């Protein structure tokens, strides 16, 4: 147990030590200040502005929103066509045919929205061109869009009596050039050094060391080893909280995540930028205490989730504990729940990844969440159901938590009978309506989607498990879509018209509705003047506010999802211990 605590602590300490300086760097990128990469990248940046005709025009929130939607729509059309037509396009050594219309729609919606839900297996259903030119490019762009919207919101707090929130095209260009590309290059090289594949070779057939005899008597003497440009996609899928694996089993695949060191790199990359953005927020609003307060709230929720998942998976189930074949060589010490986990990562590496990937809207996996204990699986589900605000996706996680902060100061204002304020700006009914829209988009979409799927005979027949766990598989799928996460309980037959279309629509809804509402809040705040701090102003940087913020986040999650969780993982847990 002490070794496990040491590992958990080490992961978290490294994360904090990396996030603080990166947050300062991102703040400089946002403000177009000089950074150490400026001499190298500035000529490329200016060339892009010149070729595309991008100027320094300040956009109001409506124009910024239109730019976000128009850019995403163009990306949607391109990626949808690429999925349909990949069979007649180059860089397809395996001759993989185009995807069906519904799978193409689902995949396109998934990657445009930074969700990366995968109803396909990459090595058998997508060509190198689609993976590289389609999915990898969208991993960069969708992450950049989320961070750009956060930048606009920060400007809404810092600017006074204005209407402009910055220029979307300049924000997006700088985020990709100065942040996402450099980090991805470094991580890609490190992953290749560990054995992650990066090539354009055809798949290779290799002889097995020991042949396999099937039940029907046939003998298998060889296997197909997939190839491809995986490392470059894996790097940005982690850094951009995208999560879609190059291979079907994601980062549980030995060619995508070969070693314990690659596992550490990929795992830290999940939360690196979301955590750093908290410090960017504090720096750029010129009050670092505010950024630290939000970081501590997120970090506290992450630690609670990590502890519950870790203890649950380490203890296993009563059935495993009674089985003398699963132990670590010590008397009466269970080996934990190793079902669905890679032995090279173990319970600690798998539990940490599960907490990180569902706290962020990443969704990549190095173990199968469907095989987690009921409580461990429930916590991963709840992290998504909270709206992906425990760090969450790059950009969108922080602006989601800021929406909760606005609700928190409003509730506190009602308690003391004062007009609520946040960061020197008055919070009025318009901001509250938009904040509630941000916070309610996720639970509404999850619950409606899960309810419709639960009464669909086609979906029920596709489940590999019945009863409480079968319902959990449905609830997890729609929680993943509603949280823009992308991970799954794998027992659900995902590649059906109903699942592809319904989940695709939910992903689009929960991505763009909160995004536009966030820009609307920014557009309202930027026009307001700063309010002087008074005796009655609620401090939003102390432990009291942090506690209130955590309480509000958990309250919304508990009230919204407890009935559904009671029918799924909680019922399964009670059945298990009965």
Curated annotation (Swiss-Prot):
Pfam families: KdpA. GO terms for molecular function: P-type potassium transmembrane transporter activity; potassium ion binding. GO terms for cellular component: plasma membrane. It is a multi-pass membrane protein. Signal peptide: none annotated. It is found in: Cell membrane. Keywords: Cell membrane, Ion transport, Membrane, Potassium, Potassium transport, Transmembrane, Transmembrane helix, Transport. HAMAP family: KdpA (MF_00275). Belongs to the KdpA family. Part of the high-affinity ATP-driven potassium transport (or Kdp) system, which catalyzes the hydrolysis of ATP coupled with the electrogenic transport of potassium into the cytoplasm. This subunit binds the extracellular potassium ions and delivers the ions to the membrane domain of KdpB through an intramembrane tunnel. The system is composed of three essential subunits: KdpA, KdpB and KdpC. This is Potassium-transporting ATPase potassium-binding subunit. The gene is kdpA.
């Amino acid at each position: 147990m002490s070794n496990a605590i040491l590992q958990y602590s080490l992961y978290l300490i490294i994360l904090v030590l990396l996030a603080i300086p990166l947050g300062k760097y991102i703040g400089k990128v946002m403000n177009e200040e000089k950074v150490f990469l400026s001499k190298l990248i500035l000529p490329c940046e200016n060339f892009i502005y010149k070729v595309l005709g991008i100027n320094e025009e300040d956009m109001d929130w409506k124009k910024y929103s239109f730019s976000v939607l128009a850019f995403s729509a163009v990306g949607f059309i391109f990626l949808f066509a690429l999925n349909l037509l990949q069979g007649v396009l180059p860089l397809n050594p395996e001759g993989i045919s185009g995807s069906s219309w519904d799978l193409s729609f689902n995949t396109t919606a998934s990657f445009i929205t930074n969700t990366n839900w995968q109803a396909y297996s990459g090595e058998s259903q997508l060509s190198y061109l689609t993976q590289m030119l389609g999915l990898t490019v969208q991993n960069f762009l969708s992450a950049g869009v989320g961070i750009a919207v956060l930048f606009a919101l920060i400007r809404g707090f810092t600017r006074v009596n204005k209407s402009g929130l910055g220029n979307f095209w300049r924000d997006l260009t700088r985020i990709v050039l100065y942040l996402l590309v450099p980090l991805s290059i470094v991580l890609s090289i490190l992953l290749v050094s560990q054995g992650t594949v990066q090539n354009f070779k055809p798949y290779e057939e290799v002889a097995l060391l020991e042949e396999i005899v099937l039940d029907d008597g046939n003998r298998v003497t060889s296997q197909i080893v997939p190839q491809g440009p995986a490392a470059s996609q894996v790097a940005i899928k982690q850094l951009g909280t995208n999560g879609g694996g190059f291979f079907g089993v994601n980062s549980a695949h030995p060619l995508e995540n070969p070693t314990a060191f690659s596992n550490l790199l990929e795992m830290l990359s999940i939360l690196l930028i979301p955590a750093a953005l908290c410090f960017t927020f504090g720096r750029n609003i010129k009050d670092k205490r505010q950024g630290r307060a939000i970081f501590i709230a997120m970090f506290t929720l992450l630690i609670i989730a990590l502890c519950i998942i870790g203890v649950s998976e380490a203890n296993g189930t009563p059935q495993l504990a009674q089985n003398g074949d699963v132990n670590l060589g010590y008397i009466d010490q269970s080996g934990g729940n190793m079902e669905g986990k890679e032995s090279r990562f173990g319970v600690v590496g798998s539990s940490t990844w599960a907490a990180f990937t569902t706290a962020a809207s990443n969704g990549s996996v190095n173990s199968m969440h469907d095989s987690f204990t009921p409580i461990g699986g429930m916590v991963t589900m709840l992290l998504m159901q909270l709206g992906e605000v425990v760090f969450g996706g790059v950009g969108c996680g922080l602006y989601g938590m800021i929406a909760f902060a606005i609700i928190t100061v409003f509730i506190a204002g009602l308690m003391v009978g004062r007009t609520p304020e946040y960061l020197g700006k008055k919070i009025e009914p318009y901001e509250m309506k938009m904040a509630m829209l941000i916070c309610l988009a996720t639970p509404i979409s999850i619950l409606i989607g899960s309810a419709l799927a639960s009464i669909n005979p086609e979906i029920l027949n596709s489940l590999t498990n019945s009863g409480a766990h079968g319902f959990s598989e449905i609830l997890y799928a729609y929680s993943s879509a509603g949280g823009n996460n992308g991970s799954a309980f794998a027992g659900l037959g995902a590649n059906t018209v109903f699942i592809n279309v319904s989940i695709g629509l939910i992903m689009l809804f929960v991505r763009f509705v909160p995004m536009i509402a966030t820009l609307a809040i920014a557009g309202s705040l930027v026009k307001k003047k700063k309010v002087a701090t008074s005796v009655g102003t609620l401090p939003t940087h102390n432990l009291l506010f942090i506690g209130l913020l955590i309480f509000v986040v958990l309250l919304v999650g508990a009230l919204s999802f407890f009935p559904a969780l009671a029918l799924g993982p909680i019922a399964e847990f009670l059945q298990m211990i009965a």
